[in-house]
Amino acid sequence: MIVNDASLERQQFEAAFDEFRALFPIALCYSKIVPVDEVVTLTLFHREDDHLKRLMLDGTQVAELDRLWEELRLVSESPLKEVDVFEQLYQFATQDADPSAFEPMREPIRREAVAFKKWLIELEPAQVSAVLDFATQAWRRPLVESERANLEALYESLRQQELPHAAAVRLLFARVLVAPDFLYRGEKATPGTKASPVNDFELATRLSYFLWASAPDDELRSLAAAGKLRDPAVLGAQTRRLMQDSRIRRLATEFGCQWLHVRDLETLDEKSERHFPTFAGLRGDMQEEAVRFFMDVFQNDRSVLSLLNADHTFVNGPLAGHYGFEVTAETWQRIDGLRAKGRGGILGFAATLAKQSGASRTSPILRGTWLSEVILGDKLPNPPKGVPVLPEEAPEGLTERQLTERHSSDERCASCHRRVDPFGFALEGFDAIGRARTKDAAG
């Protein structure tokens, strides 16, 4: 474009160019930006986020970004490394250039390194204090004065042995994490033989580990420190708060899935790939269905009866296809109307049905025993010695039910089988990986 130097058009073009440069970083205009000192560089971390800060982030986000850069500077100790890098750059660049061009850089780099080292020393007491604060979280209670003094003395002893600060702090962390107070959830009993209430910190630990399988958070610790957690209203409110948190997934996994014996289904490799080639790709989804179902029960305060008669479940696209359900998306979603499809509750999970089956066929005995012992709490005696193991596949001419009935006719086994087999036969409408069926492998 051709314009006169002093023309209005030139001013308009320059204003438009300035606006473009203000909105688009240079990286958008060039495929690659190569630093002049590409072989040996003095800049350890290049920051170019002015456009991001100015155009996209609010004040809080800018402050957080600046904090992260400062944290990177601290962790990397870049001002100290730049002293060594400068010497390498100086030796490299002055082989065929005038050294005087680089000398003005030496003193500012040295001054920044000296100031940074002084700052590191000033931070040492605060970092030791942070480890002690961490100990109160790790040990799930406030430190008593003797414990705090012992940890401080350990740090001082390590420094007197000429260990650098960073190494001494790492060992101090290790001391906190190998303490019995971290490794075990101990509760201090009162003298005598009578039962007594746990204190607030112990109650916070019980609640948090039961619901989250993890240590109490800041809010629980604060209430425990204030002596308020044993107030029934406060305890109830905190229980509901923890239940609504995403960490309740751990209760669904560690309690719900473990109770149903499907905690490890996602790694189950006992199914015959010849008979069930799709199982390996679905087993993780099967376990996830159980997790999401239990989370829904916990977070929505559903009736305990819904474990058996719920009319809904949670599936993604592949699992819905496995069940024969039609869904409009591949993502995880709730579906209703299961009872009309012959399912509902934990007895209709592919996870439970697959886990209590053999490698290539269903097992009414396994399913019935699981339902009797795990769901109903009716413990069965061990089977008598010498009872033959059922074949993995039903012999020709026998249905899977007939195979089970023939095995159960042994008088040594009949009393138990009369209790469990009807439960297992009731689930024969599902195959060994939980798909609905109207006939077994024998027809």
Residue ranges and their predicted role:
Residues 1-443:
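Low-complexity, glycine/serine/threonine/alanine-rich intrinsically disordered linker
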